From Swiss-Prot:
GO terms for molecular function: membrane insertase activity. It is a multi-pass membrane protein. It comes from the Bacteria. This is Membrane protein insertase YidC. GO terms for biological process: protein insertion into membrane; protein transport. Belongs to the OXA1/ALB3/YidC family. Type 1 subfamily. The gene is yidC. PANTHER family: CYTOCHROME C OXIDASE ASSEMBLY PROTEIN COX18, MITOCHONDRIAL, OXA1. Required for the insertion and/or proper folding and/or complex formation of integral membrane proteins into the membrane. Involved in integration of membrane proteins that insert both dependently and independently of the Sec translocase complex, as well as at least some lipoproteins. Aids folding of multispanning membrane proteins. It comes from Geobacter sulfurreducens (strain ATCC 51573 / DSM 12127 / PCA).
């Protein structure tokens, strides 16, 4: 088999298995009891900032938990006075399904009524997630440009006062939370303060949204995405994180450190089938009459690279573009840039495809020219094969002499194609995990560029264009090898059936442009030869 044929087949196989290995969603896990947690790195101790001492308070009588609602332009959130915790949070600008009437995306749900997120534990102060707080208001509405506060207060029998203050802004998806702890008792108290995120292992929403669901932590300038199967042998602890939370393909809920407020994040799988992320602060030790405060920031929103970057703490690293991030990020920014002018992400994809094709035109022209020259040498190459069929070493020497005589590079037709492979995978990443394409319509029946073509029209047309492209490509292969290569469009078509229609659109437009390019290149070469 010729070198080009072998390389093409190997690349196709690598593409197929590489896609399966790199981009397939992880297998679903069956909940099992969690083993004892193991800490990977020691947590760094940070001294919490002192705050003014509050007036000594008396323990409040036991009361039933109730809900407190807050409404902002970006989200609506329901708190429970049990723990002063977030009970439910819905994103108002994003919906579960495309089209009108879709339900809002829910990032915090009521699936686990005994463990609301974000919960708070401070065992040394007698505080657990069942403690009932007193709210400063029963409801709150935050308008565009406004900033408002909501506080929850709890007093222990020993005189320790804990106040959770949420600071809301009407301009985004972030909010600030401050824990103020005051020792109004007569004895010294100390405790770690733990913020607890609890999520169901199997979300009770559309499953495809959670195909990349799992814990995500950024620490030591590295993104840790702990797999559920790895938590079977014990919890994972990451020291001094900048942020930690849970992410799926398009959305993120995270706790962000503020001035060293996070000593460690520990993710474990509970026996009841939940993922629990415990974010520990430095130990708080308070003498009588002393108070301290810890501040965090919370984010509940889309994995939009610009939105995440505005939050700081390297939150944009939650978008894991893998090895091709250096190429994928500029492509993602270009996609948004052209959308701002066209108002249609499908058209933006077409524009980017045309630009990429123009950039690579010199390489493409060189590739087709090399293949055309190799095709003209086929009769002489076949003669050498027959002449030296029993002496492979002599045949290789004769082939190299033939190439040198005619100034032909035998791999000249392949190398330009290899250069374009990283660009394809980078664009794959940018399109596959871009929230901008989620529920973004193109035209006609394609109403969601992040979903597959519901009628499989575009992947089938794409397969047809691959066949046409192969027919137009100068061939150096014998009939048997050509038949093998003709199977590739079938393989690719089946692979692309369930790909996002935005990615299929790119590949289809790329094939059409390649056919046009090939036609003009072949014609220009034929014209030059005629002269």
């Amino acid at each position: 088999m010729e070198k080009r044929a072998l390389i093409a087949v190997v690349l196709s196989i690598l593409f197929f298995y590489g896609y399966t290995a790199l981009f397939s969603p992880p297998p679903k896990e069956t909940p099992k009891p969690v083993a004892t947690a193991t800490q990977s790195q020691p947590a760094q101790q940070v001294t919490a900032a002192p705050v003014p001492v509050a007036v000594p308070a008396q323990p409040q009588p036991a009361v039933a938990a109730r809900d407190v609602s807050v409404d902002t332009p970006a989200y609506s959130v329901t708190f429970s006075t049990q723990g002063g915790s977030i009970k439910r949070l819905d994103l108002k600008r994003y919906h579960e399904t495309a089209g009108p009437g879709g339900k809002n995306v829910t990032l915090v749900s009521e699936d686990n009524p005994s463990n609301y997120t974000i919960g708070l534990r401070a065992p040394g102060f007698g505080l657990d997630q069942n403690a009932v707080f007193v709210p400063s208001a029963d409801a709150l509405t935050v308008g565009p440009g406004e900033k408002k506060q909501l506080s929850f207060t709890w007093v222990s029998p020993a005189g320790v006062t804990v106040t959770k203050t949420y600071n809301f802004s009407g301009d985004g998806y972030g909010l600030e939370i401050q824990y103020q702890v005051t020792n109004s008792g007569s004895a010294r108290v100390s405790s770690p303060v733990q913020t607890v995120q609890t999520y169901p292992l199997v979300p009770k929403v559309k499953e495809s949204r959670f195909e990349t669901f799992g814990p995500a932590t950024f620490a030591q300038d590295k993104l840790f995405e702990d797999k559920v199967k790895d938590l079977e042998s014990g919890a994972k602890t990451h020291a001094a994180p900048l942020w930690s939370g849970f992410a799926d393909k398009y959305f993120l809920s995270a706790v962000l450190a503020h001035e060293g407020s996070m000593a460690a994040a520990t993710i474990r799988k509970t026996a009841s089938g939940y993922l629990e992320n415990t974010i520990s602060s430095p130990e708080l030790s308070l003498n009588p009459g002393e108070g301290r405060a810890l501040t965090y920031r919370l984010f509940f929103g889309p994995k939009d690279i610009d939105v995440l970057k505005a939050q700081g703490n390297s939150l944009e690293r939650a978008i894991n573009l893998g090895w091709f991030a250096m190429l994928a990020k500029p492509l993602l920014h270009s996609l948004k840039f052209f959308h701002n002018y066209t108002g249609n992400y499908g058209i933006a994809i077409i524009i980017i495809t045309v630009i990429i094709k123009v950039i690579f035109y010199p390489l493409t022209h060189s590739s087709y020219k090399s293949m055309k020259e190799m095709q003209k040498l086929q009769p002489k190459m076949q003669q050498l094969r027959e002449k030296y069929k029993n002496d492979r070493e002599a045949m290789n020497r004769a082939m190299m002499e033939l190439y040198q005589t005619h100034k032909v590079n035998p791999v000249g037709g392949c190398l330009p194609m290899l250069v374009q492979i990283p660009v394809f995978f980078a664009l794959y990443k940018a399109l596959m995990f871009s929230i901008e394409l989620r529920h973004a319509p193109f035209m006609l029946w394609i109403t969601d560029l992040a979903a597959k073509d519901p009628y499989y029209v575009t992947p089938i047309i794409m397969g047809v264009t691959m066949v046409i492209q192969q027919k137009m490509t100068p061939s150096q292969m014998d009939p048997v090898q050509q038949k093998m290569m003709m199977a590739l469009p079938v393989v690719f078509t089946f692979m692309f059936l369930n790909f996002p229609s935005g990615l299929v659109l790119y590949w289809l437009v790329n094939n059409v442009l390649t056919i046009i390019q090939q036609y003009y290149i072949n014609r220009s070469i034929s014209t030059a030869e005629a002269k």
